[in-house]
A protein has these predicted regions:
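Short, charged, surface-exposed hinge/linker loops at domain edges
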Residues: 1-8, 37, 41-93
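Short aromatic-glycine-(Arg/Gly/Cys) micro-motifs in beta-strand/loop hairpins
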Residues: 7-26
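Generic alpha-helical hydrophobic packing signal
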Residues: 21-23, 30, 50
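A short, exposed loop/beta-hairpin motif centered on an aromatic-Gly-Thr core
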Residues: 27-38
C-alpha cells in the first residue's frame, strides 16, 4: 500500500487581462482560468500532477526541501509565512 501525505501550499490569485492567475507558493506552480474558482481548480490539478511526477522521478524530497519544506513526524511542513506584502519601486524609463 502506498503511503500518502498532505502537502499544503499558499495560493495567490490575481487578474491578468481577462484571466485569473493562481500561484502556489512556495512550490512556484501556476495556472489560470476565466474565474478565480477555475484558476484555483486548475492550480490544484497542476500542483497534484507536478508532485506526482516529482515522486515518480524520485525528486519529490529534493523539490520540497528546496522550496522550504521540512519533513517532521512523517509529514511535509511548509514554511510559516511571516508576511505577504505588496511593494513598489520607482524606476526611470
Amino acid at each position: 500500500m502506498t503511503k500518502t501525505t498532505d502537502i499544503e501550499y499558499t495560493v495567490q490569485i490575481w487578474k491578468e487581462g481577462n484571466q485569473f492567475v493562481a500561484h502556489a507558493m512556495p512550490l512556484d506552480v501556476m495556472s489560470s482560468g476565466l474565474t478565480p474558482e477555475e484558476a484555483r481548480k486548475a492550480l490544484d490539478e497542476a500542483v497534484h500532477l507536478f508532485l506526482i511526477t516529482a515522486a515518480d522521478m524520485g525528486t519529490l524530497q529534493e523539490i520540497l526541501e528546496e522550496a522550504g519544506y521540512e519533513f517532521r513526524q512523517g509529514n511535509w511542513i511548509g514554511p510559516s509565512w511571516v508576511a505577504i506584502e505588496k511593494h513598489s519601486v520607482a524606476v526611470s524609463a
